[in-house]
Amino acid sequence: MPVLGPERRLLASLSSAPPAAPRLGLAANQTNQTGPQCLEVSIPDGLFLSLGLVSLVENVLVVAAIAKNRNLHSPMYYFVCCLAVSDLLVSVSNVLETAVLLLLEAGALAAQAAVVQQLDNVMDVLICGSMVSSLCFLGAIAVDRYVSIFYALRYHSIVTLPRAGRAIAAIWAGSVLSSTLFIAYYHHTAVLLGLVSFFVAMLALMAVLYVHMLARACQHGRHIARLHKTQHPTRQGCGLKGAATLTILLGVFLLCWAPFFLHLSLVVLCPQHPTCGCVFKNVNLFLALVICNSIVDPLIYAFRSQELRKTLQEVLQCSW
């Protein structure tokens, strides 16, 4: 956990850091060379805490609602539940990290450097693992929806509970393993490129599947329109509504995740270039966007379900 230097987030250590302080933030890489004036967005600790707490509450409610309602005990909602757990871990790690850093800076918590380093490693693994698992479950949800549309009659024989369980177990195991290796070898170029390639693969998978689903939905809409002789209004409505949904799904994904992975790419491509250094200075902003994704995910993938919203109301009533 970097307690020195201008960068306060754990994943700031993903950059190439100076030998004297290998776990400091990206801004520590900057030298006294003349370069372009940089716009650095400062993210207050209070904002990190607020985002983490909002995400924490949202995702706890999603998990509680799915656990309470047996009608939601299906592979589709299990994937949504695991996505909520992944986002929950992102929130928990962020809240814990921010709280510990504030206590250390205020002198209210005394800890040896070795203890802080071990805590740093644990937090790094937790954050990286939750990020990897979150991306995996976003892809799994896309695959599940694709199968439900294109193989509707065979869906329940293809996506069974045992298969979904094995997929979920594999994702969690792979996330823990990959995050551990990533933190251990974060200074290797191949590791950073592997993580960036994984993000690009997930983006391509989601884009291909959702675009294909949109095309099938519009094709089905045109078929219905021909039967009712209302072709043009239906086609236009299908295109606008489908494009809006697709824009929300992929737009939010890109907005929240792409800046962070662009940052990793630049760490590999131009670690010492002044212009890239301007990007490095905003790593806290990129991590805040990742946390924002944990807030938006329940709104897109969970709360749109009428059954889940009804159960959520029951959970809230019981809590009061």
From Swiss-Prot:
The chain crosses the membrane at residues 41-66, 76-96, 122-143, 167-186, 195-214, 244-269, 283-303. Glycans are attached at residue 32. It comes from the Eukaryota. Its main location: membrane. Changing residue 164 to V: In allele MC1R*4. Changing residue 124 to N: In allele MC1R*3. Keywords: Cell membrane, G-protein coupled receptor, Glycoprotein, Membrane, Receptor, Transducer, Transmembrane, Transmembrane helix. The keyword Disulfide bond does not apply. One of its GO terms (molecular function) is melanocyte-stimulating hormone receptor activity. Belongs to the G-protein coupled receptor 1 family. Receptor for MSH (alpha, beta and gamma) and ACTH. The activity of this receptor is mediated by G proteins which activate adenylate cyclase. Mediates melanogenesis, the production of eumelanin (black/brown) and phaeomelanin (red/yellow), via regulation of cAMP signaling in melanocytes. Interacts with MGRN1, but does not undergo MGRN1-mediated ubiquitination; this interaction competes with GNAS-binding and thus inhibits agonist-induced cAMP production. Interacts with OPN3; the interaction results in a decrease in MC1R-mediated cAMP signaling and ultimately a decrease in melanin production in melanocytes. PANTHER family: G-PROTEIN COUPLED RECEPTOR. This is Melanocyte-stimulating hormone receptor.
